[in-house]
Amino acid sequence: MKARKELDRSLQSLEGLIAQSNAFDLLGLVRMYTVPPTLEGHRESESQSSPATLELVASMIRHRAAGDDAPAPDPSTDPGEIVIAAERAIDAHLWLLLSESTEGHHPLAELAGQFRMTELRVRGRQYQSVQSTVEDELFGVAAVSELMDRHLGFSYNDLQRVRVAFGEQWSQNRSGSLEELHRLYEEHKDDEPTDELRAQLQAAMHTAMFKPGVSMTVTAEEISQRSGLSSETCTSVLDAFAVPFDTTRTPIEAAQAFLRGDNELLLRNLLKDSRGRYFGVGGDLGIDGLRPIFEEAIKPVQKAWDRYQKHRGVVAERLAARHLQAVLQPDRSYESIKYFRPIPGTDAVTLGSACDRPATHGEPAEADLLMVIDDIAICVEVKAAAISTSARRGSVLRLAKDLEKTVGDARSQADRLADLIERNHGLWVPDEGWLDLSEVREVRSIAVTLEDLSSLNCSLDALVRARVMPAGRLPWVVSLHDLIVTTRILDRASELLLYLRRRTDSEVATRYSGIDELDFVMLFVEGQLWVDLDPAVMHAKYPKAPRLTGADRARYRKEAQLTRVGTHTDDLDAWMYYTDGLVDAPAERPSFRSDDGMDELVDALAAHRGQGWLSTSTDLLNGSSEQRASIMSSITRLLRAARGDGKRHSLFVALPGPWGFSAVVFGTGHGARDSGALAALSDYAAAKQYQLEVDRCLTVLLNAEGAVLGTAYRGRGFRNLRRWSCGRLRWACRIRQPGCASHRLTPVGQVGDFAAGLGELAEASVCG
């Protein structure tokens, strides 16, 4: 196979290139070539380097025969040759992985291959402030910090101090060598160069650019002086995240193990030489290794492990709840709620509100978090278990088992709760009785993992094919880190619900594929995470719409293609780096905002918080920029007319979509004292809801300046209005009475081009 030959050839070339030069000098040159000197202006989408390149070279140098004792690199040494050989080896291996995954017969083979590729190439998947938030909660408590001290030889506070000192000392050492070169230049830039000056410049240049090993390493003594900790404690911290040189393997064997997933530098990202110097291969000290190393150390002690596991689960649940509640501001929130679920083999309806013995017909169950916001219920399950080492190295069977324990269990538990709420409109809670949830019309599920599984979570359709999750209702599967970042960006309840709807919509799940959840979030923020809806399905849902043409169906088939989601986090990175204090250049927070006025309307509905505000606000945000602008333009005309004549005016807006057919009726009254305006407007809305078979309709009464005065909501569908008399319907729908005018509006609602037909149903009336 061509890829196999290229891999062997590249590794042999790499072995020769790294055979003799000083280890840390050589690694320093490669680091200078592959790692940006600063995050200022860094854009991941434009970066051509990968942390895996430096790690592969470091793994081979660690196991070479010369060890850490070799002369400095010759000035003619070209690190570019080393980098090119390493990148060729990695690329060839990725081709082999791709071939293996597509030829595998297990339903998870493709996903396992994608997981291995991500584990090989992606590093630094946590923003500093978010990582600190999680680690502080997890390790900052006294009991866990004491466990760390007992089993690792240092406390969490010790680790934090060493981390800070390591970064500061590295920067000082590195800048010192460059400052000497800069000093000589500034002092003598106008002087005639002498032989002595040339020698000094050459020596400074050689130290800074060809012998960077000294300036890129630190010692425990340096860290001790800077941190104020003892040298022994600093050594314990550094050694916990360091690997020594080892000649028991050959460089080729080390490279092959690295590419198989046995990466010694993934968790322990320091390389230590025989003189006690530490070279940082990448990222902050222990950035990806603290939790796995600590858990590995305490797992043999059963009592300590059990106590920590319980604490770990509580922390993950608490952090998930805290950040979701901050955005959603639920009307009711239940953490660790206990309820009765159906006994296996029995129907969920046996546990309806009329059940007289729920403890007999059901069995105890617990949900991590249930939130009710308006008529929306959100079920959240949190899993703190880790993915095993063998799964990370490509074991398909072990990956399947680990995913079933995390994603699969979270999905089934959330789905079980959602099914009970949808079918019974409530739950039986032990010792408390019936929990009425009859107002809930829509149920969504979130599965949160403490482990970063982005490359797996982003492929919901593959999880369905692998039977980790059944077809049908899909949860949003997200890591705790990405959930925290998402809630910092989508800080409106309506925005987060819209993302939740789109992200778990079956059309989106099967049409978008990626390896990073935050790329999906930023794609959504940019207004690009959407699909044209199946016109046949939409017409079946809304039969009063015009008949579809062959051109409609042909366009849908043409556009129904898989989209590979690349890197979209550049703006997010810039903002996070700035807020974390890693760069000086100010950066704006990415936000799902528009300048069409819809944001102000959504905020006004949220502030009023009348029934139906959340689902309707989300439906309004779901439109395209053109559709939102059309709605706001129509509202502007409505208010202008109200200010002009002081009469009642109304605007009907249809919002058909994949999550139901909703509508909004905006209206004004006869000035501030028109007490009957809302009731009359609500009757008109009900008639239109019945006429067009609308699922839910929000009525919004505005004053002439656009402030919300009151709302009314019907969320149980048009069928509940059949008890109305024909006379009342005709009265409520008085669109063409003397003194009233009606006109067509620009189509609204997001259903692709199909919206044009339903737009004909959007009407405005002006009534005296």
Question: What is the predicted function of each stretch?
Answer:
Residues 1-329, 340-347, 360, 397, ...:
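Acidic, metal-dependent phosphodiester-chemistry machinery of nucleic-acid enzymes
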Residues 331-336:
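Conserved RecA-like helicase motor-core motifs
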Residues 353-358:
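Hydrophobic multi-pass inner-membrane translocation pores used for secretion
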Residues 363-365:
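SMC-family hinge/dimerization module
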Residues 368:
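Cell-envelope/extracellular polymer assembly enzymes that use nucleotide-activated donors
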Residues 371-379, 383-389, 653-663:
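Active-site beta-strand-loop-beta-strand hairpin of nuclease catalytic cores
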Residues 388-406:
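A solvent-exposed, charged loop/short amphipathic helix patch at secondary-structure junctions
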Residues 402-438:
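Acidic, metal/cofactor-coordinating or nucleic-acid-engaging core segments within structured domains
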